[in-house]
Design a protein with these regions (language model features):
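Domain-level signal for Mg2+-assisted phosphodiester chemistry and nucleotide/NA-binding surfaces
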Residues: 2-99
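Active-site histidine-anchored catalytic micro-motif
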Residues: 104
Length: 104
């Protein structure tokens, strides 16, 4: 289905990151793999940025041009971040802005 960039026209890829549950140290390898599939022109990280646990993402978002999306924890046991990512993914696909996704 997907081919390497050298064998095809450029695909637009969106990288959506669940920053509440993912270690930022893996971002380099993820972007390397996605770059072989297309151009990662949408980069978003979702989470509750008021939490100390997400402070480690600060330098990473700046270095890699990742746009932080604030998602408050309104209820316990529900994952609002997952829902926000899902809604944005469907919206991006519907608008025709992307050809594929990288989900972290």
């Amino acid at each position: 289905m997907w081919q390497r960039m050298s064998e095809m026209q450029a695909h637009n890829i969106a990288l959506l990151i669940d920053a509440d549950n993912v270690d930022p140290n893996g971002i380099d390898s993820v972007l390397t793999v996605l770059a072989e599939l297309g151009q990662v022109n949408i980069r978003r990280a979702y989470g509750n940025w008021a939490k100390d646990a997400l402070k480690r993402w600060g330098d990473i978002t700046n270095r890699y041009g990742i746009r932080p999306h604030q998602q408050f924890d309104l209820t316990r046991g529900k994952n609002a971040t997952d829902m926000a990512m899902t809604i944005d993914a469907v919206d991006l696909l519907y608008q025709g802005k992307v050809d594929g996704f990288g989900i972290m």
